[in-house]
Amino acid sequence: MPRYALKIEYDGAPFAGWQRQAVLPSVQGAIEAALGRLEPGPHTIAAAGRTDTGVHATGQVAHCDLGKDWDPFRLAGALNAHLKPLPVAVVAAARVGEDFHARFSAIERRYLFRLLARRAPEVHDRGRVWRVPHPLDGAAMREAAAHLVGRHDFTTFRAIGCQAASPVKTLDELTLETVEVPNGVEYRFRLRARSFLHNQVRSIVGTLERVGAGAWAPDRVKEALEARDRAACGPVCPPQGLYLTGVGYPADPFAAT
């Protein structure tokens, strides 16, 4: 059966996460239903990352096996026609080999977290940023973030129910960009690693926000990391500011699209 890789964007607000649910709406369920309108099913798609409820994506990657050969451009268009009016779009499709797996072939994943420091409520970005009503110290957050880059035991920064075999991960990148917005500042955290633990990004950003607010000293983040204790973590921030922005592979399946 021919295999196709799909690059997908979605607004996570109306979904109970990526993974198919028995009753609640999911991104996986929406795309599998769209595939079922193209070919008889059942269809199962596998994704590079199973994003949680409310988490968005601009560069999710999934793969599916279909019963006939499709022109990738036409496949993306047909899926988008059947996904309307849901906030999900297949932005690219590509034919790949049967050894390609969206999750297990990936060599890096990239996330963006948008944190807005502004007293006034967000309007145009409601549901797409995490807003806090107090100012933040960007320099202090950068100083604290530097302690987390590299290979570490991230037990402190993973969910209690995380099913990963090991808490040891290599965080290749954690950068912070500041953007002036009307009457506030948006802080954009960019994180890159081969893989992440459950709630790792939201735990890190929630902790760094405490540093920015002055509730934590930057060195306390290093102490929390070395404690290897979930109780040492700061608060887990809400999901709406988090975006899966890209997935890397040894060879880009979408290079020719």
UniProtKB/Swiss-Prot annotation:
Belongs to the tRNA pseudouridine synthase TruA family. It is an enzyme of class 5 (isomerase). It catalyses: uridine(38/39/40) in tRNA = pseudouridine(38/39/40) in tRNA. Its EC number is 5.4.99.12. Substrate binds at residue 111. One of its GO terms (biological process) is tRNA pseudouridine synthesis. CDD domains: PseudoU_synth_EcTruA. The keyword Glycoprotein does not apply. The keyword tRNA processing applies. This is tRNA pseudouridine synthase A. Keywords: Isomerase, tRNA processing. It holds the Pfam family PseudoU_synth_1. The active site is at 52 (nucleophile). GO terms for molecular function: RNA binding; tRNA pseudouridine(38-40) synthase activity. Homodimer. It comes from Cereibacter sphaeroides (strain ATCC 17025 / ATH 2.4.3) (Rhodobacter sphaeroides). InterPro entries: PsdUridine_synth_cat_dom_sf, PsdUridine_synth_TruA, PsdUridine_synth_TruA_a/b_dom, PsdUridine_synth_TruA_C, TruA/RsuA/RluB/E/F_N. Formation of pseudouridine at positions 38, 39 and 40 in the anticodon stem and loop of transfer RNAs.
